[in-house]
Curated annotation (Swiss-Prot):
Protein name: ATP-dependent RNA helicase fal1
Compartment(s) of residence: Nucleus, Nucleolus
Record keywords, A-Z: ATP-binding, Helicase, Hydrolase, Nucleotide-binding, Nucleus, Ribosome biogenesis, RNA-binding, rRNA processing
A single BP term in Gene Ontology: mRNA splicing, via spliceosome
Length: 398
């Protein structure tokens, strides 16, 4: 039984199943080589909490309920699971993802296409409000994965353009929202057309009774994964940008700031492992003391670098996003984005602080003319303001 304290209660006790193990790296998941390449090219270095627990269960074919909010890496969790189990040689729909909104369905399609970049995967977003003729053309051509909203998907199945006989997996993303928006009948409609052995994966931020009621009808002995998100906030963080005309000038700008950096401890983020190595060498050549870390390093080496940094033995750490997720060093009060993050969720992971500590801090973004759009996008996404850096930035840190 999934719930522990009365079926009609909305306060459901939910915990991770005992058989769920943690895969610390993507290599430990025994994924296809072409998929692994896509994962690294997408910018992932190590799996998030939900990814390290749920991907293996999904790949094993288990019905899975993952309670996870957005920002935890849930979309990539089921996308990687889907890409591992489909056979791209067979040009038929083998996985179906239902989402509550058109935007989410389209976003999922782009994640699947990006992660499956080396697999030659066909994925179509089948959503309301778009040209039906285009849907029919795409579906008749053959799609390995369909990501859509329940109404349009049910319609395409009824019209026999979306063929269901090869479907192995159904994913319900944001299941609580799907039911909130009154999609229950359409979901049941779709489910009726699927082969009896279809694997079902449910992802939901909350698990109200109606979600669990649906899972009992659709799922067989589901494995459960619960991941709580560490709420991150930008509150109390002063955010600035420095306009740098050319990429090559970032280095001099960083050197000018070095004395300011070492007032406390600083982390400098670059987007690639190669850039981290390059910047570390260049800083050392210029006689600056820095340490560096990225996902290619053996875990042992990473641990010892982290320990040095935690103890304050090293004051400036250059890293990729591998450092950003969930590593909390109390005394870091300055973060520099040498490169702006390629995906905006990583911005808060780099500079945000978990509410438990609510520390003050300063973030400085190096912005070339190409980056202005990304910076504006970050401001909009987080409803925050990033100002030009004042001259007295050192005073803000001391």
């Amino acid at each position: 039984m999934i719930w522990a304290n009365g079926a009609n209660s909305d306060r459901l006790e939910f915990s991770t199943s005992k058989e769920v193990t943690v895969a610390p790296t993507f290599e430990d998941m025994h994924l296809k080589e072409s998929l692994l390449r896509g994962i690294y090219a997408y910018g992932y270095e190590s799996p998030s909490a939900v990814q390290s627990r749920a991907i293996v269960q999904i790949c094993k074919g288990r019905d899975t309920i993952a309670q996870a909010q957005s920002g935890t890496g849930k979309t990539a969790t089921f996308s990687i699971g889907i890409l591992q189990v489909i056979d791209t040689v067979v040009r038929e729909t083998q996985a179906l993802v239902l989402s509550p909104t058109r935007e989410l369905a389209t976003q999922i399609q782009s994640v699947i296409m990006a992660l499956g970049d080396y697999m030659n995967v066909q994925c179509h977003a089948c959503i309301g409000g778009t040209n039906i003729g285009e849907d029919i053309r795409k579906l008749d051509y053959g799609q390995h994965v369909v990501s859509g909203t329940p109404g349009r998907v049910a319609d395409m199945i009824r019209r026999r353009h979306l063929r269901t006989r090869h479907i192995k997996m159904l994913v319900l993303d944001e299941a609580d929202e799907l039911l909130n928006r009154g999609f229950r009948e359409q979901i049941y409609d779709v489910y009726r057309y699927l082969p009896p052995a279809t694997q079902v994966v449910v992802v939901s931020a909350t698990l109200p009774y109606d979600v669990l009621d649906m899972t009992t009808k659709f799922m067989t002995d589901p494995v459960r994964v619960l991941v709580k998100r560490d709420e991150l906030t930008l509150e109390g963080i002063k955010q600035y940008f420095i306009a740098v005309e050319k990429e090559e000038w970032k280095f001099d700008t960083l050197c000018d700031l070095y004395d300011t950096l070492t007032i406390t401890q600083a982390v400098i983020f670059c987007n690639t492992r190669r850039k981290v190595d390059w910047l570390t060498d260049k800083m050392r050549e210029a006689n600056f003391t820095v340490s560096s870390m990225h996902g290619e390093m053996p875990q042992k080496e990473r641990d010892s670098i982290m320990q040095d940094f935690r103890q304050g033995n090293s004051r400036v750490l250059i890293s990729t996003d591998v450092w950003a997720r969930g590593i909390d060093v109390q005394q870091v009060s300055l973060v520099i984005n040498y490169d702006l993050p390629t995906n905006r969720e990583n911005y808060i992971h780099r500079i945000g602080r978990s509410g438990r500590f609510g520390r003050k801090g300063v973030a400085i973004n190096f912005v070339t003319s190409d980056d202005v759009r990304i910076l504006r996008d970050i401001e909009l996404y987080y409803s925050t303001q990033i100002d030009e850096m004042p001259m007295n930035v050192a005073d803000l840190l001391s």
